Curated annotation (Swiss-Prot):
Keywords: ATP-binding, Magnesium, Nucleotide-binding, Transferase, tRNA processing. NCBIfam families: miaA. Residues 34-37 are annotated as: Interaction with substrate tRNA. Its cofactor is Mg(2+). The record marks T100 as: Interaction with substrate tRNA. Pfam families: IPPT (PF01715). This is tRNA dimethylallyltransferase. The lineage of its organism: Bacteria, Pseudomonadati, Campylobacterota, Epsilonproteobacteria, Campylobacterales. It comes from the Bacteria. GO terms for biological process: tRNA modification.
Length: 291
């Protein structure tokens, strides 16, 4: 029986671990909502599911591209279609899970025409103030470099107000209705998980992975400026020591978790405490099977 649901949460919330456990039990397919896991060479920094599990489960949205290739919403839409077709053909559940909830929102809201990012050297601050002046409806945060450059790209290419252009060019949503569950943690407990995960990543070889990436690819690539890798670049360049490296990754991961929590408020969803989430989701799935 095919049906789909989404399992979202902040970084280090345990959503992937939970999705994997459910997929094993119910023979479900999984679509990853993660903008880093799409890259074959980024494993530790993306906290990617181990290869054995990827081989055993029907996984989509992982190991699609090389680091120097560009991933965008249109490619993610194609991966979703592939995952859904596979799950329907095999009478499976499709679990959509990950931390890049922007992709999930796009699936549910529809995709606008694929405009190129601006190549302008304007700073985030400069783009943000331009946006506030001519397009206050855009509502993009000052630290969201990708969306600000995308906004500026639309403005440069059309010479029109970007939020209006996006409304005019929007395509139909791929998902009309979806049950969404968010894994919740108390802030102090999530903080401990972030600290533990950071230490584990460093012990597993994060610095070595970063060195390999920076030795072989342009450090300006968007994927290489993600949390965990950009701090390692400063460490490898001897700008910071090991203690500072760990501290910065923890701080930046905590800040990311806060942004994710804020973004996830946009969804109509059910919040689940991690400790009881597995049993609650299991009951939800069994109820769906019973009709």
């Amino acid at each position: 029986m095919f049906f789909e649901f989404a399992l979202i949460g902040t970084t280090a919330s345990g959503k992937t671990e939970l999705a994997n456990k459910l997929a094993y039990e119910f023979n479900a397919s999984i679509l990853s909502l993660d903008s880093l896991c799409v890259y074959k060479q980024i494993n530790i920094a993306s906290a990617k599911t181990e290869q054995k599990t990827l081989d055993e489960l029907d996984y989509f949205g992982i190991n699609l591209l090389n680091v120097n290739e560009h991933f965008n919403i249109a490619l993610f839409f194609e991966e979703y279609k592939k995952a859904k077709t596979f799950a329907q053909k095999n009478n499976q559940i499709l679990i959509i899970t990950g931390g890049t909830s922007f992709y999930l929102k796009a699936l549910m809201d529809g995709l606008s025409e694929n405009f190129k990012e601006s190549q302008s050297t304007l700073s985030n601050d400069e783009i943000y103030h331009l946006m506030i002046k001519i397009d206050p409806q855009a509502k993009i945060e000052k630290n969201d470099t990708y969306r600000l450059k995308k906004w500026l790209g639309i403005y440069e290419q059309t010479n029109k107000i970007p939020s209006e252009v996006l409304k005019e060019t929007k395509q139909e949503a791929l998902i009309k209705k979806l049950d969404i569950f968010e894994i919740s943690w108390q802030k102090d407990l999530l903080e401990k998980r972030i600290i533990k995960r950071t230490k584990n990543m460093l012990n597993e070889g994060l610095i070595e992975e970063a060195k390999m990436l920076f030795d072989n690819y342009d450090h300006h690539l968007k994927a290489l400026n993600s949390i965990g890798l950009k701090e390692c670049k400063d460490f490898l360049d001897k700008k910071i020591n090991l203690n500072k490296l760990e501290e910065l990754i923890i701080i930046h991961t905590r800040q990311l978790a806060k942004r994710q929590r804020t973004f996830n408020k946009k969804f109509n969803k059910e919040n689940l405490d991690f400790q009881s989430a597995y049993e609650n989701l299991k009951a939800y799935i069994l109820k769906k099977y019973q009709g």
